[in-house]
Amino acid sequence: MANKIKKGDTVVVLSGKDKGKTGEVTQALPKDGKVVVAGVNVITRHRKPTQQNPQGGLERKEAPLFASKVALADPKTGKPTRVRFETRDGKKVRVAVKSGETING
């Protein structure tokens, strides 16, 4: 199945501790069915001191979310929408179901 959410898309989180937050997809992991969204699902990792990082300490980073837990933000309204594929001018494009707007990318 084709990827409906791609890197650079603006998405809305549908469930979980970050429900309702919006952010840009920084990484798409289609084999795992997950996406990484900027500023969402931030976790803290305790890092030991190493030669590259002699200080060590706490590292905050975004963890992947299941793609089913996010929805693309409609380009017109900013609300969550589903995505469908259509052929326009001989090219396969992604279209927001709610508004019918073509999605970039």
UniProtKB/Swiss-Prot annotation:
The keyword Chloroplast does not apply. One of its GO terms (cellular component) is ribosome. GO terms for molecular function: rRNA binding; structural constituent of ribosome. It comes from Sphingopyxis alaskensis (strain DSM 13593 / LMG 18877 / RB2256) (Sphingomonas alaskensis). Keywords: Ribonucleoprotein, Ribosomal protein, RNA-binding, rRNA-binding. Pfam families: KOW, ribosomal_L24. GO terms for biological process: translation. This is Large ribosomal subunit protein uL24. The keyword DNA-binding does not apply. InterPro entries: KOW, Rib_uL2_dom2, Ribosomal_uL24, Ribosomal_uL24_CS, Ribosomal_uL24_KOW, Translation_prot_SH3-like_sf.
